[in-house]
Amino acid sequence: MNALTDADYVDVKLTAAEVLLASHVGCMRNVQSLKKATDRVEPEPRKYWQSNIIGAIGECVIAKYFNIYWSGAVGDWRAKDVGDFEVKTNEQIYKKNVLMVKKGNSPDRKYFLVAGNAFNYRIFGWVDGYDIMSEARWGDPPHNSPLD
């Protein structure tokens, strides 16, 4: 798998058990955030549950594809998502998917873009953290720039 391109993607099908496991991880992460009253950079606060669950499912997809153990870490927001990778997940496959990063994200990791729903997901590829964090890649601010 190469860096992000329009023609380079891989489809991954999760089992019901894998989706259930990842969903539980997302729920645990959300409860922990609520308990700690963590300040979050979330465009729509009512989607906290959704973003945590979808994010955990995306991590599960990458772990399955690369056959890497996924701990589903809860409580350490600085931990890497899967192995040495970070995963960004959209809940649907669009004609043009966008990999969004935050300014605080680590530039020394590879960022994978995953999209899908139910049991069917697509890995669109990856981009180097240093590359995506450079202002030249931000696109049309504020829509494609790293979030504050």
Please tell me what each predicted stretch does.
Residues 1-83, 88-148:
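Nucleic-acid endonuclease domains
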